[in-house]
Amino acid sequence: MPDTHVVTNQVPPLENYNPASSPVLTEALIREGGQWGLDEVTELGALSGSRQAQRWGELADRNQPILRTHDRFGHRVDEVEYDPAYHELMKVAVGHGLHAAPWADERPGSHVVRAAKTSVWTPEPGHIC
């Protein structure tokens, strides 16, 4: 479909950026003993700002979870059906230790590294609650 006009009053999509590139975040990680996690935080930040992760966030927000209380035979099942994008977001979050890494890692600064990862993993914040 050809463009009908030039749109000049809208910002471009915010994608392919790294929220972990903040010098303030880097300084805080180093100061609080989490320098060992800089590479992990940077890697997660790059994924967070990617077009793919932004799309997952958009789909997860657009397609709300569906509560299924009973199956087709009337048996109680109480399950929640999530969009596959929500599962992708969760897979990344759990894979990077956002759920419990500091309690399994005794290195100094482990809570700071987790906090930094949580702050940069921003495509859709509801799945971290």
What are these regions (language model features)?
Residues 117-129:
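Hydrophobic, small-residue-rich alpha-helical packing segments that form membrane-like cores
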Residues 105-116:
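Active-site-adjacent bridging/hinge elements
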Residues 1-107:
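Extended, charge-enriched "interface" segments that sit outside catalytic cores
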